[in-house]
């Protein structure tokens, strides 16, 4: 597998506040562990979007991992041309910084937002340009990623397409492991 689509919860859907929120540290830890596993299986490209939450955290994690795995590439694909233009200025600035850091950035639609068809075209693009997906989503805790989950399931009925679904129980396991590692690091410092 060489191209992985990573997406999931938006930051507001899991109640994170500020860049130092412990939930964000756990999410980034989980992303890092999962991307490392995929690197051992031949991962070359991570494709994600620019949404606040899992997608932007993924870009930050992959950019950090590139220090040890320089062959790893990350692409930010956006559904339409003016993506993020309605956000708060600090969120817009963060998006711009991430755009400058990735290996490739483009919009699937080169028009400004016209309607939900652009989002569906974006999903189709991501499915057709990746070999598998990693989705941070739990059907019992709905969020906008439910639309990606549904389209991936539909795609799987037509063609083999591996999906790794990280639910809340698995996130709790990552939180426990992360907490134990932090306590161990604090003990030995």
Curated annotation (Swiss-Prot):
Pfam families: YpsA. It comes from the Bacteria. InterPro entries: YspA. Coiled coil: none annotated. Belongs to the UPF0398 family. This is UPF0398 protein LCK_00599. It comes from Leuconostoc citreum (strain KM20).
């Amino acid at each position: 597998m060489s191209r992985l689509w990573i997406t999931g919860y938006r930051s507001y859907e899991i109640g994170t506040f500020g860049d130092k929120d412990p939930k964000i540290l756990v999410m980034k830890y989980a992303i890092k562990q999962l991307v490392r596993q995929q690197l051992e299986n031949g991962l070359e490209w991570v494709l994600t979007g620019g949404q606040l939450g899992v997608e932007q955290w993924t870009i930050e994690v992959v950019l950090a991992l590139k220090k040890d795995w320089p062959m790893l590439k990350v692409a930010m694909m956006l559904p339409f041309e003016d993506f993020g233009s309605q956000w708060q200025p600090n969120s817009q600035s963060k998006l711009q910084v991430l755009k400058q850091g990735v290996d490739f950035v483009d919009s699937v639609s080169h028009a400004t937002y016209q309607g939900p068809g652009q989002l569906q075209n974006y999903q189709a693009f991501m499915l057709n340009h990746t070999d598998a997906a990693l989705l941070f989503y739990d059907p019992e805790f709905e969020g906008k990623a439910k639309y990606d989950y549904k389209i991936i399931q539909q795609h799987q009925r037509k063609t083999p397409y591996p999906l790794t679904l990280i639910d809340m129980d698995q996130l709790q396991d990552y939180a426990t492991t992360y907490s134990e590692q932090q306590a161990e690091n604090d003990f030995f410092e």
